[in-house]
Amino acid sequence: MDLGRPNKEYIRYVFKTPEYEKFVSSLNPKVRQKFDYVVDVITTIYNVPTKFIKHLENTDLYEMRVSIGTNEYRTVIFAIDNHNFIEAGNVILLNGFFEEGQQRLS
């Protein structure tokens, strides 16, 4: 687990499990760059748009959302010190996966 502390300008500390790190390292560089961008948004923006973070209904979990073209990637997130992601100062990225899109019928 990555326990590195960001500097004080950050709103949230983001911890990364080995499973998350392994998933992200398996992705191509362009996708990894987008993951880094979304993590930066999470750490520096108080009200993170639902484009990047969405609460999973009936759970204490959230998902981080990364979109590259038509490809959708998700990472399960847990807010460590608050039930509400926005109020959380510490979050952990648990694991990621590729979400297959729905095919459009013509």
Locate each region found by the language model.
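Basic, Lys/Arg-enriched alpha-helical interface segments
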Residues: 1-72, 83-90, 98-106
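A short loop-to-beta-strand scaffold at the N-terminal edge of the catalytic core in hydrolase folds
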Residues: 74-77
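Conserved catalytic cores of phosphodiester-cleaving nucleases, focusing on short active-site segments
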Residues: 94
